[in-house]
Each structure stands twice: as structure tokens, then as C-alpha cells.
């Protein structure tokens, strides 16, 4: 009798032992998957990332391997590298023109652009947004019991069937021994969105795209029509880099609801060994930001949070373009948390970072916005006349207790000085603030103006008696005409009148 009971239980025991403890996204057998999907595995407990093995994606019809991630390659650099005296700014402006958009499918990652040398392929490398030099990236990111796999961008296509294999040891968790051929299959949507001017992004796959980058990749270069990209509430952990995009509105569900972020900085994605970046117009593009709009004009970002997850020279948002508007956007970075090049309008937004919170050679007009740092200068403004620098109207600046902040510095940077630097503050409030106002003004010719500043706690006029000798307090009556000009965005932003009700 006991033998019969035991034999009857054998099929149940076998089924229990063969049950996969992991859930998959896209689900096994899923159809209608967006080609820009990440691959997500949810384990019963926190997995560990192995140091070797492969994750591969195959075309189920042809058997061809369409993508391969080698876990033996490190994600990127973890220590700053040393640059020699031969590293300098390019002698010719960077060329943004292109006859086609390079991707991982048609171009070898690491192919140099501009005057750069080839990017070494001894670490993870992927082309994002057509930047052929490539970005270092994490092939797998683990948070708690969720492992997210990042295929190389733009390799999956519409109307295809795929299966995924994961070597044993790539992800280590009790009961998980990898994924074998044919066990994890899915098929992509037959074709892209019918309405190419109104695109939706949702991390759960319910939109036209799973990623912000996927939606931006779908926008043609220099498109004259407006493209509206709506990003659903959710967490979007990805590097976003777009170039040559125009007339795009990217809308989230609110700065507390839609977050786009990545662990990126100058160490992880440094500039080339022989080419400097950031300082001059036409310089080699930077790859260190979590979110970058490069050579992009007439863009609106609204109702979202953009952040980097690393410290150092680490932009949350890097902007290079004309007429870029930020509305109800929270930007989180470290040093150079916001890099602003071009003409930028910022309203009802927040910026959180470390010293030199704002870097840039462009013009920034900020209205009703809040700026927080962990002590030190809020800016290292580098504008050159006739362009204006940074202007703040009815904004708030705040440091930390015992670590006061200041408006900024314009001190010498190597051989470079900033005689045209401009930083103007009108009717703003401060808290935990350096009585000098500006920690360093390198040139007497710099335009450092202030009017109507109040203490955020008392509401009383701020004590400006110790302000830097090269700064000037504007008189509301005597300087009324100049104050009115600085409060006019069009006067500051080279004739552009941004909407104040976006």
C-alpha cells in the first residue's frame, strides 16, 4: 500500500522539482512585444550576478544569434583615468551630419566620430542614439530580487520571433540554472506605431515603446512636425541620448511619478583620451549624462524626474540646443547636475546636486524654480557675449546646515578665464547661504547682479553687506529698466519667447 502511494506521488514531485521559480518579462510565449524591451527576471530571493557566461537572443525562425552579452567583460571604468598633455579640444567643430542613423545593427560600437580615437572594446559597449563611439553600460542590473537584462540597443525588430538563453552561473539563485534553448520565447509586434507623431512609453510594455530612448529613436532627424511623446508613470532606468531631434514634447506623469535615471558619470563614460569635451562650442559630445539632448532644438520636457545615480562629474540632464523648455522637471545630479548649452527656459522645476550644480556656456532663464546643493557654488557659468548667462527670477537657492551654498564661481580654469560670465538673481530667496553671494569671481568684467533677495525663513531682505566686491546690487528705482529687461525671457534668450503655460 505504501509503495502504491509513493508511486502515485512521483509525478507530483517531479512537477514540483521542474517548476521554474522565476517569473519572466516578456512572459514566456508573449506576443506583441515592443522591440526596445528589456528582459526582466523576478526571483524568489535576491540573485547574484556572475562574472562569466553569456546571455543570447536568437531569431527563432532562422536560429541566428541576434544579440550576445558577455558577462566576463566589465561594465565600464570605476576609477578616473589619466590624461596626458596631448589631450586637447578638437581643432575643428564636431560634425553632427549623417546620411543614416548608425545603430548596433549596422555599425561596430566604438567606431570613432569627430577627431576621437576608437573606443576600446574591452568593456561593455553599445551605440545609443547614433553615437558610434558608444556608451559603457551594465548588461544586467539587479535591484532586490529583480534582474533586468539590457540588450544592445536597436537589434530586435518588428515582426520577429525570438528566444533567450542564459548560461548557468550568469545569475545565481537557488533553484535557477539558467535558461535553455526554446524555454523563453516571445514575439514582437508586427509593425511600429501607426501614429508616428503621438508616441507612448510605458515600462510595462503597454505603450508604443518600453523605453524613452526607443521613442526618441523613432523620431526622424530635424523633423519639422511636432512629435508628442507621453511617458507613463514608472521607473525608467536607462541612458538616454538623442541628437539632431527637433520639435519634440516629452511629457511624464509628474516629477514624483515618472523617473528616468541611470548610474552614469565621467568615470564610467569618460571623454576620449585625446579629445577634451564640454568647454567650447563644437566640442566633442559628452557621454557622462543620464539624459542628454545633443544638437537638439525646440524641445519641451515636462512633468518628470531626470537623475543620475552616481557622484562626481555627473549630469542628470545635459542640454545642447536652442529653445529647450523645462516645465515641472526635477533634475538630480552631482557636480554639473545640469549642463546648459544653448538657450534654455526652466519654470516651476527643481535642481538638486553638488558643487557647480549648473555648468554651461549657454543661456538659462529660470522662473519659479528651486535649486538645492550640498554646499558650494551653484554654477560655473561660461557664456561668451553677446549671449547672456544664467538669469533667475523668483527662484529659491538652498545649501545645507553648516555647508552653505553660493551663487557660483567664475574662476580661471587652466588657461581659460570667463570675462563675460553673467549670473543675475532677481526677487529670489536663500537658505543656508554664503554671505559672499559668489565664492569666486575671476574677472571684474563679469556681470554678477542681484536684486530683492530675501531670507527664506524670515521673509526679510537678505544681508548683502558682505557680497563679493565684483558683484553689484541693483536698485529697484534707479535700475528699473535693466531689471525689467532681465525679467523678460525674450530679452535674455536671444528673442525667444517661451510659453509660460505649458
Question: Which residues make up each language-model segment?
Answer:
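Sec-dependent signal peptide recognition
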Residues: 2-8
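Acidic, low-complexity Ser/Thr/Gly/Pro-rich repeat segments typical of extracellular/periplasmic
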Residues: 19-193
Amino acid at each position: 500500500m505504501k509503495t502504491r502511494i509513493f508511486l502515485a506521488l512521483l509525478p507530483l514531485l517531479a512537477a514540483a522539482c521542474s517548476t521554474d521559480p522565476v517569473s519572466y518579462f516578456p512572459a514566456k510565449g508573449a506576443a506583441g512585444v515592443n522591440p526596445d524591451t528589456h528582459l526582466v527576471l523576478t526571483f524568489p530571493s535576491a540573485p547574484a550576478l556572475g562574472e562569466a557566461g553569456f546571455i543570447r537572443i536568437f531569431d527563432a525562425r532562422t536560429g541566428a544569434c541576434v544579440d550576445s552579452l558577455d558577462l566576463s567583460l566589465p561594465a565600464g571604468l570605476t576609477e578616473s583615468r589619466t590624461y596626458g598633455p596631448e589631450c586637447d579640444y578638437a581643432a575643428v567643430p564636431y560634425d553632427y551630419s549623417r546620411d543614416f542613423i548608425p545603430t548596433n545593427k549596422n555599425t561596430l560600437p566604438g567606431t570613432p566620430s569627430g577627431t576621437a580615437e576608437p573606443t576600446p572594446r574591452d568593456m561593455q559597449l553599445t551605440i545609443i542614439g547614433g553615437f558610434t563611439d558608444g556608451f559603457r553600460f551594465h548588461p544586467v542590473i539587479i535591484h532586490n530580487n529583480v534582474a533586468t537584462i539590457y540588450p544592445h540597443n536597436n537589434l530586435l525588430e518588428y515582426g520577429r520571433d525570438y528566444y533567450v538563453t542564459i548560461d548557468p552561473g550568469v545569475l545565481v539563485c537557488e533553484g535557477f540554472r539558467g535558461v535553455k534553448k526554446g524555454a523563453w520565447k516571445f514575439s514582437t509586434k508586427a509593425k511600429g506605431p501607426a501614429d508616428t507623431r503621438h508616441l507612448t512609453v510605458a515600462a510595462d510594455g503597454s505603450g508604443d515603446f518600453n523605453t524613452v530612448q526607443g521613442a526618441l529613436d523613432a523620431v526622424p532627424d530635424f523633423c519639422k512636425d511636432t512629435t508628442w511623446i507621453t511617458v507613463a508613470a514608472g521607473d525608467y532606468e536607462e541612458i538616454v541620448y538623442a541628437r539632431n531631434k527637433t520639435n519634440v514634447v516629452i511629457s511624464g506623469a509628474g516629477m514624483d511619478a515618472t523617473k528616468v535615471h541611470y548610474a552614469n558619470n565621467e568615470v564610467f563614460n569618460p571623454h576620449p583620451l585625446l579629445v577634451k569635451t564640454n568647454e567650447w562650442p563644437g566640442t566633442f559630445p559628452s557621454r557622462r549624462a543620464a539624459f542628454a539632448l545633443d544638437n537638439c532644438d525646440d524641445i519641451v520636457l515636462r512633468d518628470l524626474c531626470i537623475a543620475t545615480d552616481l557622484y562626481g562629474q555627473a549630469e542628470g540632464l545635459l542640454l545642447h540646443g536652442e529653445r529647450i523648455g523645462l516645465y515641472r522637471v526635477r533634475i538630480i545630479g552631482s557636480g554639473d547636475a545640469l549642463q546648459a548649452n544653448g538657450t534654455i527656459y526652466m519654470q516651476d522645476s527643481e535642481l538638486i546636486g553638488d558643487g557647480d550644480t549648473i555648468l554651461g556656456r549657454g543661456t538659462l532663464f529660470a522662473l519659479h524654480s528651486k535649486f538645492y546643493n550640498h554646499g558650494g557654488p551653484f554654477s560655473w557659468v561660461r557664456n561668451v557675449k553677446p549671449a547672456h548667462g544664467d538669469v533667475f527670477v523668483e527662484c529659491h537657492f538652498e545649501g545645507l546646515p553648516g555647508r552653505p551654498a553660493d551663487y557660483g564661481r567664475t574662476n580661471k580654469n587652466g588657461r581659460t578665464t570667463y570675462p563675460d560670465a553673467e549670473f543675475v538673481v532677481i526677487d529670489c530667496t536663500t537658505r543656508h547661504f554664503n554671505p559672499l553671494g559668489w565664492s569666486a569671481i575671476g574677472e571684474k568684467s563679469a556681470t554678477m547682479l542681484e536684486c530683492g533677495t530675501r531670507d527664506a525663513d524670515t521673509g526679510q531682505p537678505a544681508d548683502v553687506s558682505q557680497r563679493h566686491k565684483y558683484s553689484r546690487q541693483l536698485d529697484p528705482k534707479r535700475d528699473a529698466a535693466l531689471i525689467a529687461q532681465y525679467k523678460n525671457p525674450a530679452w535674455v534668450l536671444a528673442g525667444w519667447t517661451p510659453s509660460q503655460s505649458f
